[in-house]
Each structure stands twice: as C-alpha cells, then as structure tokens.
Amino acid sequence: MSRRRVVITGIGPITCVGHGREDFWNGILAEKSGINKIVSFDPSAFRVRCAGEIRDWDPEVFFPPHRLKRLDRYAQFAVASAKLALDDAQFEYSREKPQHRVGVSFGTALGGVCKAEDQYIRYLKKGARGVQPTLAVQVFGGSAHSNIAIEFGFRGVGTTNSNSCASGTVSVGEALRYIRDDFADVIVAGGAEAPLTTITVGAFDIIKTMSRWSGDPALACRPFDLLRDGFVIGEGATSLIIEELEHARARKARIYAEVLGYSLNNDAFHMTAPLPSGDSCIRAMRDALADAQLAPGEIDYINAHASSTQLNDGAETMSIKQVFGKDAQRIPVSGTKGYYAHPLGATGAIEAALCTLALDRQWIPPTINYQNPDPACDLDVVPNHGRKAQLNYIMSNSFGFGGINACVILGRVR
C-alpha cells in the first residue's frame, strides 16, 4: 500500500527579519541580522543586551481590540502567522462552516510567559483584583493551537507540543504523520514564542547559555565561529500549511515542497549539554533519512540547529560527519540563527519555512557573521553569502534543551 504524500502549500513567517513570505525571504537575501538591543524591558540587571525582538509588531493589523484582550503576545504571533500561511495557500476557511479534516499542530517552549509576568506584576501592585479574568486561558501552552482552531473553524486534530527548541520541527513532523496516516487532509503546523521577559532572559543568563556580546548586536549570534559565546534569544512565529498531495492538487494549490521524513528522540543525558558521543543526534538524522527513503549522499543542503554555543555547534558538526561520512565535506551546512536569533519553540518552524523557500528558489542561505573558522566545525558552512544551487532534498535539524532531537527532510515534488 502506497503512503499518502504530504506537501507544503502555504508559508507564514513572523520574525525580526520580516513578516510574510516575501518580506521574510527578502530579509534573508539581504544577508543582514535582525538582532538588536532589547527595548521591551530594561536588561541592565543582566549581562545579556540583545535579542531577536520584533519591534514593528502591530497586532491591530490582524485583530480587533476585543480579541487582543484574550491573546498573549505569543498567541498573537501564532494566529497571525496562521492567517498569513492560509492566505498564502489560498485555502478557504470559515468559522460558520467548520472543517473536520483540517487540524492544528503547534509548538511552543514557554507559552504565555509574557502575560504571566505582566499579570504577576499587576498582582503585586493591586492584589487579585488587578489580574485579568482571562489570565488562565492566555498563559497555557495550548492557547496558540486552540485560538487558531477557533479563529478559522478547524475541528480536526488539535495538538500542542512543548519540546523546547525542537517544538516547531516536531509540529511539522507530527503533521506529516497525521496526514500520512489519514487522520487529516490539512494541518496548520508551526511554532510561536514571545519569551522576552525579565524572568526568561534572567533565567537563561544565570545558567550562562546566552551570548554576552557587548558590541554591535547584529554580530552577537555567530554559528560555527570560533568566538561564538552563546545563543541569542528571539521571538516570533511561523505557520506552514501541510497538506495531502492529491488534496492540494484537486484545489490547484501552489506546492512549494514535499515533507518526506521525520524523526524524534532524546539524549537522556543532560538538560543543557548534548550527549558527548552524539549518538542520539546521529540516530535522529539517520532515522529521518530512513523515513524519507533517502541515502545520506542524496541530501543537498543541511540547515543546522547551530545555536551559536560552543558545545552545540561542535557536537552537531561531529554528528553530521558520522552520518554523512565523506559527503559531509561536500554538503553545504549553514546555521541561520544569525538572522532571526533563537525564538525557542518557534525556531524549527521558521527554519522549515526557510528550507521550503530554499527549495522553491534554489538558493542556499548563508551562515552570516562568520569571521573566525573553528577547526572543530570544519564543514562548508556557506560563510556570509548565500549561493545558487540545485536543491532536491534538504535536511533541517533541531536539537533542544533537555536533549530533545528532531529532524525533518523536505524535497521537491516529483
């Protein structure tokens, strides 16, 4: 029995380098970082000074005022990105005519932490009477996927995962499984995060995982660079319309790429450090290749997790060499977080969108801010400038806190 084939028909990024498909892609082509100084709160109590902050966000473009009272910032990003993706896919929706074969698979690491901190401050100042009565339904992690389903009338599969930095990739991979196994025909898959709060930045600063770069903020995130000193936190969301191939063809949808393979596993080792042997990362890539029914040498480009930490980038390089052998030196491997920072649970979805566009446009995005080669990261990291290439198959890695490893493989539709 042949497997149901699964494709991507809509893309809706909201990041610090652009909102919507073309704005985002133009930001990538510009080869400049969207990272800047934090302005949403005073970071002077911390050694962290910069983030991938979305300064031009205007929620009233997407929502009437009464809706905003019930949406945390991360849920605003989620619902807005879903609308961008649905419109890009030219997919018809209506709350008055709900659809039972259309679902939502979304990811977030921290959910409504922004609203939680805001309301806790209100509680300290005014007591319980100062707290919004809708607080409970704004802060829980599932509020993003629930609000997407409510907004657009999708009554099919509904799920939220909170797999740290791998959440967005997991949401895409699980959408593949739901559709392949005939639980749905269409899934809105993605991730959203709005973690720029004192409690979140402070917590990561304490454990010394974030960059303490004090120079030009645009240079703070330096994947694979010898002098990288930690990840840069960001915010945003991306939704992808994941659809069964014949369903997409029947409605004459534009098809960007096919979702071919997915894997998910755990290091079972440490909350912040990767498994020294790289065994689980290696298995994740090999399992995704097996699911996609591809040989390692067929991959044309790898979008690495490459969070700009000393441990992660080196460990990922070692794992790629183990999986791809002699092909590891030939296959371009870029880390793209220098553009949009690391929006935690949204990152994997952002990178899935970037890989989808790379396939569609036949162009490999670079590792920007690469200045000092690291002998431990001796791959073709596509330094500073992108390049045209013949791309048929792309792998995207997400290796998150807690040792959660996810990998998806995309390809051109044949």
Label every model-predicted segment.
Residues 10, 28, 82, 104, ...:
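Conserved small-residue
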Residues 1-67, 246-258, 353-367, 411-414:
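ACP-dependent fatty acid/polyketide chain-elongation machinery
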Residues 39, 183-229, 262-276, 306-313, ...:
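Acyl-CoA/ACP chain-elongation machinery
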Residues 8, 23-24, 32-163, 192-201, ...:
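Conserved beta-ketoacyl condensing-enzyme motif
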Residues 125-132, 170-173, 177, 194-250, ...:
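Glycine-/small-residue-rich "gating" segment that lines the acyl/pantetheine channel
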Residues 42, 85-98, 247-255, 284-301, ...:
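Phosphate/pyrophosphate-binding loops at sites that engage ATP/ADP/AMP, CoA/4′-phosphopantetheine
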Residues 5-9, 36, 215-292, 300-301:
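Condensing-enzyme catalytic core mediating Claisen C-C bond formation in acyl metabolism
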Residues 78-91, 141-145, 149-152, 157-193, ...:
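Active-site-proximal alpha-helical scaffold in enzymes
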